[in-house]
Design a protein with these regions (language model features):
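Adenine nucleotide phosphate-binding catalytic loops in nucleotide-utilizing enzymes
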Residues: 3, 181-186, 223-300
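Residues in the short beta-alpha loop(s) of Rossmann-like NAD(P)-binding domains
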Residues: 4, 29-31, 130, 207-208, ...
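Phosphate-binding loop of NTP-binding sites
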Residues: 15, 54-59, 66-223, 239
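Short beta-strand "acidic-cap" motif of Rossmann-like dinucleotide-binding folds
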Residues: 22-27, 125-126, 148, 227
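Flexible, glycine-rich phosphate/dinucleotide-binding loops
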Residues: 7, 32, 91, 133, ...
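Alpha-helix C-terminal capping segments
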Residues: 16-18, 116-120, 279-285
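N-terminal leader/targeting and accessory segments in enzymes
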Residues: 1-84, 266, 286-289, 300
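Hydrophobic residues within alpha-helices
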Residues: 10, 109-113, 280
Length: 300
């Protein structure tokens, strides 16, 4: 459902594994009826334009692209039949994924994490909202790959598995065009940590007042909740002391980034992004030396 960049990659992957499976492609744009790749496929049926949603109730599985608004589904629709590239990818590779979401800052943070890990010698790929559609990365994934995913609220809305390392930067009252309410948008963002498993990590900004409120008293279901803050808070989590960053977990306090000489991306908001990127990379196996080198060589 939705035949843009991600929808096309979904079609190609499914067709590669199931060359004669009947597929229905739904899109609001009627011009896809002229797409040469689709017109040459006798096992495809197109449902386009205003009538694209007329037969939603007849499908067993709906693979929804992130650009398709959830409001197109009828009230009380069985959402258990809705999945996505993000959902299926996380079900299979979630234990290798560092996922990043937030109303602001997610592209910078995702790119910085990818740069630190790649410059440290890890096999790293960037997928999701920036980088490749998830399905296009599958052929290159190895057991040692670190997969960085930038995730929008639309990509998170119908997932059933969260990333191994989840990062929630902030939530602000923006990008609400696909949602019936601000609360619905908030809940979609919170999905990034909602389905974590034992020994996963959920990093979230304690400096964002809404996140503090939403996650106050949150009980870990085996995963580790790690707030981060620009203030000097040595409780469990990530904190700044002068221009150094520390990670405090059950195993003690470790310095993970030394920014005494500054960082190449200006502003307190970017220092916060660099803090959580450093923590994610440390949890993914990078050393403090590798983190410092990666941060200093980042071009933004």
């Amino acid at each position: 459902m939705g035949f843009g960049r991600e929808g096309r990659s979904s079609y190609r992957l499914l067709r590669n594994y199931m060359p004669e499976q009947k597929l229905y492609i739904l899109d609001s744009n009627p011009t896809i009826s002229e797409d040469a790749e689709l017109t040459s496929d006798s096992h495809v049926e197109l449902q386009v334009g205003p009538s694209m949603t007329d037969q939603l109730g007849t499908f067993d599985i709906i693979l929804k692209a992130p650009g398709v608004p959830a409001r197109l589904f009828p009230e009380n629709f069985d959402t258990g039949r809705i999945t996505s590239q993000t959902d299926l990818f996380l079900r299979h590779y979630g234990n290798q994924v560092i996922g990043v979401t937030g109303t602001k800052g997610k592209s910078t943070t995702s790119s910085l994490i990818h740069h630190i890990l790649a410059s440290s010698g890890f096999h790293t790929m960037l997928v999701g909202n920036i980088g490749l559609p998830p399905f296009e990365a599958i052929g290159d994934i190895t057991p040692g790959s670190r997969i960085v995913m930038e995730l929008s609220s639309h990509q998170l809305q119908f997932i059933s598995r969260s990333p191994h390392i989840a990062i929630l930067l902030n939530i602000f009252q923006e990008h609400l065009d696909h949602y019936g309410s601000y609360e619905e948008y908030q809940q979609a963002k919170l999905n990034i940590g909602r389905y974590q498993q034992k020994n996963d990590y959920f990093l979230y900004s304690e400096d964002n007042s809404l996140l503090q409120s939403l996650l106050a008293g949150e009980k870990s279901g085996g995963h580790r909740l790690l707030p981060y803050s620009l203030t000097d808070k040595p409780e469990n989590g990530v904190f700044r002391r002068e221009r150094k960053v520390f990670l405090h977990t059950d195993s003690g306090i470790r310095e993970i980034m030394d920014a005494t000489a500054g960082i190449p991306i200006p502003g307190e908001h970017n220092f916060s992004n660099a803090m959580v990127a450093a923590a994610a990379c440390y949890l993914a196996g990078a050393s403090e030396e590798q983190i410092n080198r990666g941060v200093q060589s980042f071009k933004g």
